[in-house]
């Protein structure tokens, strides 16, 4: 999504970290120097396919498999191709500090990509983890907006820094999104933000007139 704004970066996963021991590690590389372009991400359009990655570390491989199967069962209502990969380390070197599992899903649509995820925890069935992620994705897709409930707040920052007017359609005006908006107004008082909708954390449309010149 950030590539649409001209933000050039890459992220590589070295190892995962789960509560409480943590220990996760990623490598992020980015190129600076160019101005960000405004974003036009309002409606998602038709769903084309769904992908995903279900993982577990220091746990039996069937945990990741069950998460994936449960998610796929929920997502079949979309009637599109679904491919959820499974990642585990059973029987091989495992650099992780503690056990954990999770699943990330993404829906590729005509004009956007929306995601949903869930983490495992002690006493929580793998099937519940998969269903939670799939249900979250379906809920956001049902709004018809281009951004899921997590991307809705994160992209507001980049839109505020982009040169020009951005229009963002978010699945949910969460408390996080409202906090981001308040912070942008405090730090970048010249940036104009107009919000339509969003009552009771519902779908919303944001119009942001930003740019580094507003600093």
What does each model-found stretch correspond to?
Residues 66-114:
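Oxyanion-binding "anion nests"
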Residues 21-24, 97-101, 202:
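A short, glycine/Asx- and small/polar-enriched loop/turn
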Residues 4-7, 12-71:
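Phosphate/diphosphate-binding glycine-rich loops and adjacent basic-rich segments that engage nucleotide
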Residues 6-16, 75-96, 140-154, 167-170, ...:
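Flexible, glycine/charged-enriched surface loops at secondary-structure junctions
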Residues 54-58, 140-142, 159-167:
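Glycine-rich phosphate/diphosphate-binding loops and the adjacent beta-loop-alpha structural elements
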Residues 123-140:
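C-terminal, non-catalytic macromolecule-binding modules
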Residues 1-6, 44-51, 129-134, 149-164, ...:
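Proline/glycine-anchored alpha-helix kink/cap motifs
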Residues 161-215:
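Internal helix-turn-beta structural module
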């Amino acid at each position: 999504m950030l590539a649409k704004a001209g933000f050039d970066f890459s992220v590589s996963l070295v190892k995962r970290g789960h509560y409480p021991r943590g220990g996760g590690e990623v490598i992020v590389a980015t190129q600076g120097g160019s101005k960000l372009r405004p974003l036009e991400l309002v409606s998602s359009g038709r769903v084309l396919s769904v992908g995903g990655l279900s993982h577990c570390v220091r746990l039996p491989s069937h945990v990741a498999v069950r998460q994936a199967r449960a998610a796929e069962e929920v997502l079949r209502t979309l009637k599109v191709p679904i491919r959820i990969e499974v990642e585990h380390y059973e029987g091989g070197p495992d650099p992780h500090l503690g056990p954990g599992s999770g699943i990330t899903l993404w829906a590729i649509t005509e004009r956007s990509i929306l995601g949903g995820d869930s983490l495992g925890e002690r006493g929580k069935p793998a099937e519940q983890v998969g269903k939670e992620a799939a249900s979250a994705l379906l809920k956001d897709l049902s709004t018809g907006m281009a951004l899921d409930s997590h991307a809705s707040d994160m992209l507001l920052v980049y839109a505020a820094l982009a040169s020009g007017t951005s229009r963002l359609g978010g699945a949910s005006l969460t408390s996080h999104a409202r906090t981001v908006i308040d912070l942008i107004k405090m730090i970048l008082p010249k940036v104009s933000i107009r919000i339509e909708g969003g009552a009771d954390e519902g779908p919303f449309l944001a119009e942001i007139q930003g740019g580094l010149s507003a600093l």
